[in-house]
């Protein structure tokens, strides 16, 4: 599963996820992309589940790029523990997703195969997505 090798601080504030993605919003590496249209948090497990789905559907053909990385720790207190006595321990890692963020890219397969693979992967993700093609400049 994806998570940082080391961090400066173990825990982070929750923060607010506002605005739209400017950087990382275009298809940069492959021919086709899966772009988020709503905001949310994607866990490392969800990223891996969607990656496996894409990989299995294209029968390990083509090349996949994961354009998001879970770099934010989410802490949680154990069940039935009273409030206070500090922040809980880190439970999992998430990637903050803004509308317009490119999540995955794919090349080396046909467009209909890529569309179907991304449709199946989108079912594993908590954000709404759209299929995106590379625009030649």
UniProtKB/Swiss-Prot annotation:
Keywords: Ribonucleoprotein, Ribosomal protein, RNA-binding, rRNA-binding, tRNA-binding. The keyword Ribonucleoprotein applies. InterPro entries: Ribosomal_uL16 (IPR047873), Ribosomal_uL16_bact-type (IPR000114), Ribosomal_uL16_CS (IPR020798), Ribosomal_uL16_dom (IPR016180), Ribosomal_uL16_sf (IPR036920). GO terms for cellular component: cytosolic large ribosomal subunit. It comes from the Bacteria. CDD domains: Ribosomal_L16_L10e. One of its GO terms (molecular function) is rRNA binding. The keyword Nucleotide-binding does not apply. Part of the 50S ribosomal subunit. HAMAP family: Ribosomal_uL16. Binds 23S rRNA and is also seen to make contacts with the A and possibly P site tRNAs. Belongs to the universal ribosomal protein uL16 family. This is Large ribosomal subunit protein uL16. It comes from Methylococcus capsulatus (strain ATCC 33009 / NCIMB 11132 / Bath).
């Amino acid at each position: 599963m994806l998570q940082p090798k080391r961090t400066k601080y173990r825990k982070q504030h929750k923060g607010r996820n506002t605005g739209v993605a400017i950087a990382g919003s275009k298809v940069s590496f492959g021919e086709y992309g899966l772009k988020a249209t709503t905001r949310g948090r994607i866990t490392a497990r969800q990223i891996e589940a969607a990656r496996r789905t894409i990989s299995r559907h294209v029968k390990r053909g083509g090349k996949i790029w994961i354009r998001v990385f879970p770099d934010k720790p989410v802490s949680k207190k154990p069940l039935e523990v009273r409030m206070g006595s500090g922040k809980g321990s880190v439970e999992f890692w998430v990637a903050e997703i803004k509308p317009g963020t490119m999540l995955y890219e794919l090349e080396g397969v046909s467009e209909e195969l890529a569309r179907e693979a991304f449709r199946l992967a989108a079912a594993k993700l908590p954000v709404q997505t759209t299929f995106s093609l590379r625009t030649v400049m």
